[in-house]
Swiss-Prot record:
Protein name: Threonine--tRNA ligase
Gene from which the chain derives: thrS
GO cellular component: cytoplasm
HAMAP family: Thr_tRNA_synth (MF_00184)
NCBIfam families the record matches: PRK03991.1 (NF003068), thrS (TIGR00418)
InterPro entries referenced in this protein's UniProt entry, alphabetically: aa-tRNA-synt_IIb, aa-tRNA-synth_II, aa-tRNA-synth_II/BPL/LPL, Anticodon-bd, Anticodon-bd_dom_sf, DTD-like_sf, Thr-tRNA-ligase_IIa, Threonyl-tRNA_syn_edit_dom_arc
Compartments (UniProt record): Cytoplasm
Cofactor: Zn(2+)
Catalysed reactions, semicolon-separated: tRNA(Thr) + L-threonine + ATP = L-threonyl-tRNA(Thr) + AMP + diphosphate + H(+)
Annotated Zn(2+) binding sites: 298, 350, 474
């Protein structure tokens, strides 16, 4: 349920027409209404509320009364308002929930009015404008069914005691509340976010508007929340990122595999691992057997490793899969655009190491690999904050190693230390992006796992022919691909707030060059130019719309096109092109071959995919609005 609470001088409404087939029956008197000195509750009842309407009604009544007490309102008004959500409950459910809220407020002794359900209504409202006059609330019911919650998650949510510090590149370990965050504002935000451990998304982050405006990604009302649809431009960006990260990991030395997306709850090793991994699962029934959808590639890669014959000469042994998809049944209130999903694409590498020294060596290399991967998508260490998590014993034994990592990143990092080991790992780092709402999301991460080799029966033969259990490193050098897209868009949103021009990295731009003829007369030359550019494996399109040149240029600017090429009589006669480069705003005249050379130099070493849409703008559908 979504509520907008407005403390008002008055609210008045007038019914105009039916909005649904079977609206609430009303009398002539109820077609108009007014209430003065009133707290108005605009309410959208959502589909998720159908799971537990009793709880939603009770929570809504309590929220409204709490605000009424704060603003000293005795008059309350319940206004059905479908426009606060895109995932509405059935009209029959919504009407009943609203009726019960209305009756419940009356029973608590308030003077309560309401607008009828299921009609188009005109309304006027006069907001009082004080600090508490406009408030929003989101109510999420507990699951009606008992959900599978692993023991590790229960411990994380109830028992885990963390000790927080800041570690500097000079090796100084400072309690977080004693650290001077001057010059490290983002680190302060990240530390506050981590220590609070609140993941609820109470506002829409800026990247959501951008992903919709650019027709990249959208919500899918026909699926479970947290499962998204990708339009052609968004699919191109996601596909290029998938290819880029996979190539980097394979180049690093990993062997690519493919494994199932669902696993048996009753498999002894898997059952134990589930209770050591802090994540909620999707449950799938096949006949009378219960399966869970994977939340990482661990299971499949561990099962392969268990069945393999491995020598010490094979170590470190690296195995990789890009999971499309992994699934985590995140709480509804925590879902947020591309930042936190229930279905996501995870590059997942596991490395078997013979001992702690080899594991540390791999950990450091994968730390560097992660920095390199994020650098390729336009994220520098200035764009993310580092968290390193370990037990007190590990710190005491390997302090110098941890400080080496901090020196690599070149700035202070957040430390989470535990007196005892709660999870299967003894050391973990993440690179975390802090967005425009001061929420953080983990991107790259590596862990050293000391439990699962024995749990799954993964062994190698040492120099003496004896079977030993390896250590296992879990590594995602980028984090979920969707989160990389989120970080890129949030970074551009921040640049826009600073008055700077946003743009995708050139190799990721869905259209890298747009050719604009000054008039229809020069369309043939524009197509010739586009053909030459496309032949060099550069994504190019042509704006053939019959509109003013200035409007075409504005459209290209709005789409963040890196290179705008304008052609007219002069360019046609001289065989040249006039280029407007978004990166620095420079406008210059050049030859087609020179532009091709410039773009190829800037995109060297990155993957390429063809243009995702028709060449001519006039031939393209609109996917939104």
């Amino acid at each position: 349920m979504r509520m907008l609470l407005i403390h008002s001088d008055y609210i008045e409404y007038e019914v105009k027409d039916k909005a649904i087939k079977n609206p609430e029956p009303i009398s002539e008197e109820e077609k108009k209404g007014r209430m003065d000195e009133v707290l108005v509750a605009f309410i959208s009842v959502e589909k998720v509320d159908e799971k537990n309407p009793d709880e939603v009604v009770e929570k809504a009544i309590n929220e409204i009364i709490e605000v009424a007490k704060q603003v000293k309102a005795e008059n309350l008004f319940v206004y059905p308002f479908a426009h606060l959500s895109s995932e509405l409950a059935k009209p029959s459910v919504a009407q009943e929930v609203l009726r019960r809220i209305y009756e419940g407020l009356k029973e608590r002794g308030y003077n309560v009015g309401k607008a009828p359900f299921g009609y188009y209504k005109a309304f006027r409202i006069s907001c009082k404008g004080h600090p508490l006059a406009e408030l929003s609330r989101t109510i999420v019911p507990e699951e009606a069914k008992v959900e599978e919650v692993p023991e590790a998650l229960k411990k994380e949510e109830t028992e885990l005691v963390s000790y927080w510090y800041i570690l500097t590149p000079e090796g100084e370990l400072v309690e977080v509340d004693k650290f001077d965050f001057t010059g490290h504002e983002n680190l302060r935000k990240f530390a506050n976010y981590e220590i609070a451990k609140s993941r609820i998304a109470d506002k829409e982050p800026p990247h959501v508007r951008l992903m919709l405006e650019h027709e990249l990604v959208d919500y899918e009302p026909g699926s479970d929340p947290g499962n998204l649809r990708y339009y052609p431009k968004g699919r191109l960006i996601k596909s290029l990122l998938e290819q880029y990260v996979s190539e980097k990991v394979i180049e690093y030395g990993a062997m690519e595999v493919e494994t199932p997306i669902m696993y048996d709850f009753e498999h002894p090793a898997l059952e134990k691992y589930l209770n050591r991994f802090p994540a909620r699962q999707y449950i799938v029934l096949s006949g009378d057997k219960r399966y869970f959808l994977r939340f990482a590639a661990c299971f499949g890669q561990f099962m392969i490793s268990k069945d393999a014959t491995i020598s010490y000469r094979n170590l470190p042994l690296r195995m990789y899969e890009l999971t499309r998809y992994s699934f985590r049944r995140e709480k509804r209130g925590e879902l947020s655009g591309l930042r936190r999903l229930r279905a996501f694409t995870m590059p997942d590498m596991h490395t078997l190491a013979k001992d702690i020294e080899q594991a540390k060596d791999e950990f450091k290399k994968q730390f560097k690999l992660s920095m390199e991967v994020l650098g390729g998508v336009g994220l520098t260490p200035d764009d993310y904050e580092v968290a390193i998590r370990f037990t007190e014993d590990f710190w005491n034994e390997h302090k110098d190693f941890i400080i080496e990592l901090v020196k690599l990143i070149g700035k202070p990092v957040l430390i989470e230390m535990w007196k005892q080991r709660f999870f299967y790992f003894i050391l973990k780092f993440e690179f975390n992006f802090v967005d425009n709402l001061d929420k953080a999301a983990a991107l790259s991460t590596v862990q050293i796992d000391v439990e699962n080799a024995e749990r799954f029966g993964i062994t190698y033969y040492d120099e003496n022919g004896e079977e030993k259990y390896p250590l296992i490193l879990h590594c995602s050098p980028s984090g979920a691909i969707e989160r990389v897209m989120y970080a890129i868009l949030e970074k551009q949103a921040k640049l826009m707030q600073e008055g700077k021009k946003p743009m995708f990295p050139l190799w990721l731009s869905p259209i890298q060059v747009r050719v604009i003829p000054v008039s229809k007369e020069y369309l043939d030359y524009a197509l010739y130019v586009a053909g030459k550019i496309e032949g060099a494996r550069i994504r190019v399109d042509v704006d053939d719309e019959d509109e003013r040149l200035s409007k075409k240029i504005r459209r290209a600017e709005k789409e963040w096109i890196p290179y705008i090429v304008v052609v007219g009589e002069k360019e046609k006669e001289t065989g040249t092109i006039t280029v407007r480069r978004r990166e620095d705003g420079k406008q210059y005249e050049t030859r087609i071959e020179e532009l091709i050379k410039e773009i190829k130099q800037k995109t060297e070493g990155f993957p390429y995919k063809p243009r995702p849409l028709p060449l001519l703008l006039s031939q393209r559908p609109k996917f939104r609005g």
